[in-house]
């Protein structure tokens, strides 16, 4: 089987946008690279991050390696290594992209074979 793609709709819990953006602002290039490598090692890749405003919402497109289920991805994105960064600041609604409707063409080049 092939990897799966998810669109994630992130929206902030009350009063959490400021603290979340504060943590994001502290992440330098080295920290971001380390985080991306950690995600790859556990089978996830963030293809794009699309915030609409500082108060949200935000959208992302993620890829999950074959073997990681939809439930696994929800646990990851809600957990300390996911978008919440350990703060429980976001509600994360995941939507699996139906690649059967695209003729099997993924929205991005696959990172996982």
Whereabouts are the PLM-identified features?
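Short S/T/G/P-rich N-terminal loop/turn motif that feeds into the first structured element of a domain
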Residues: 1-57, 63-75, 94-113
């Amino acid at each position: 089987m092939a990897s799966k793609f998810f669109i994630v709709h992130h929206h902030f819990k009350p009063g959490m946008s400021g603290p979340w953006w504060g943590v994001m602002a502290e992440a330098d290039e080295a920290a971001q690279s380390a985080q991306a490598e950690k995600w790859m090692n556990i089978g996830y890749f963030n293809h794009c991050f699309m915030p609409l405003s500082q108060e949200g919402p935000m959208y992302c497109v993620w890829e999950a390696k074959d073997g990681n289920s939809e439930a696994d991805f929800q646990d990851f994105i809600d957990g300390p290594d996911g978008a919440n960064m350990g703060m429980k600041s976001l509600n994360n609604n995941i939507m699996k992209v139906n690649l059967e409707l695209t003729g099997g063409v993924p929205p991005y080049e696959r990172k996982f074979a």
